[in-house]
Amino acid sequence: MEVKKNAVKRINSDQFRLKLQGYLADPSKYNCSVTLGYPRTAQKSYGRERRLLMCYPAVVLGGGGWRRRLEILRNSCPDDQCRIHRLTHNSVFDAENQKKTCVSAEMMTTNGEVWRIPEAISLEVPAMAQLRINDMSDDVSVKSTLLKLRLFYQGCDDVGVFTSKSISVVSKPHRSVSVTPVSNNLSFKSGDIITLSVRSTKMTRNLCVNGGVICGDLPYYSTFTIHLVDENMEEGTQIKVRENETITYGSVVKLVDTEENIGLPKMRILRADERGIDLSTEPGLYEVLHFQRAAFQFLDDPNLFLGLDDKDYQTVRAKPCIQSGFLSKTGQRIIEPIPTETWLLIPHETIVYTFAEPDGCADGPVTPAPLFESCMEFAKGEYVTVNGMGFTPRLQAFLDDIPLDTYYKNSESVVCRLPTDEEREVSVARLRAAGIQPKSQLCLLRDDGVIYPSTFNFPRKSIVKEEPSC
């Protein structure tokens, strides 16, 4: 194989096997996850202050490894004035400090601008970054940007820099809308994850689900899956959706919250701009594009639209806005719609980095950390290609505790040789003797002992012997 030119130096498996088995026995004790949610598209603004507009990126830390990391750092840090030392010196955290991680965060863009997330991040609590990203580059033709999240303990340890995927940059949407099909990837499809915002000169509010109640909030938001559904579909616990179809104005859609799985009633999505809401659009004619404004009309009452109560500035209730009666005729619009009836549609993406340090905190940053996206077996299942981002030559693949021959191709791809049946049998016996259930899980191990688990499993394929035909 050509990739053998970049074969990764094999890690001493005996040296790491016991530590790896300790991790496999209880991964939740060691895993540290970094969840980064951000918009897939940013909007370019041309004015005196050139900038990119996007909804708030969100950061959530999870996993028991963060508390373990904190205890290790607190015991090893020589600075008594460190924030970690100012916490309780008891080895057992009380209820108030149980979710504290003391990790500070900064968000950066590709042009180097840095803004600080105000408070230390706590477990399972999203920390929000800034809304506006200044782009001082003279090149107004920029097509994409990146977000870089830096996590660190003040004065103690630098966790690393975690990078988003590429964020498309689009110009401010024009009033006119192109007839389908659109040549770029800026159209919404059924099954996409989106956020919905109401923006005006005074405030920006986001559609949010909190404790089962639909509300508007700032800066927090909820993500929704937008589904294409049939107009005659009955509401129920299970809905029949049309996946991967392009969403066009005039179609019937259903919004389902991704966290609490709460769905709004069926609504018709309509074009909206400063001139009003278009009531005459036929489905299949105009695609719904990123960063365009839309209105959602309830099917049960054509005079009822999804909106927000405008009386509260920061936190508002979800309240359908009732218009005076109208007749839906060709070319008719609702003139001067209330601003809280029109929504800015922004595509959203969430990525999760996971790492573990069973041997204690690494001497340096845990990044670049691999982000696993897909895998593909080839050569009759003997090899597998793992695709993603953040791969380095320092990483070697393991299947449970079996070291795999690993070939580094580039930062987005590595190739691994899967173990033989004999190697699997020896590993299964070894793990079961240690009281560990084999999972055939693929993970990457850095040469200093940092583990990056994937969600990919490669169980042994059962071989069915063919019966001789008579």
Residue ranges of model-derived segments:
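Structured alpha-helical bundle/scaffold domains in large eukaryotic membrane-trafficking regulators
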Residues: 3, 16-19, 71-74, 161, ...
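Beta-strand/beta-sandwich contexts
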Residues: 13, 19-55, 62-64, 178-209, ...
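Eukaryote-biased feature marking scaffold/signaling PDZ-domain proteins and nuclear chromatin regulators
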Residues: 11, 15, 54-56, 100-102, ...
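Contiguous, amphipathic alpha-helical segments that mediate oligomerization or scaffolding
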Residues: 7, 14, 173-176
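Eukaryotic intrinsically disordered, low-complexity regulatory regions
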Residues: 180, 184-321, 326-328
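Beta-strand-enriched, solvent-exposed domains that form extended recognition/catalytic surfaces
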Residues: 22-176, 414-416
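Ser/Thr/Pro-rich low-complexity tracts
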Residues: 151-152, 156-171, 259, 266-470
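Long, low-complexity intrinsically disordered regions in eukaryotic nuclear regulators
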Residues: 1-7
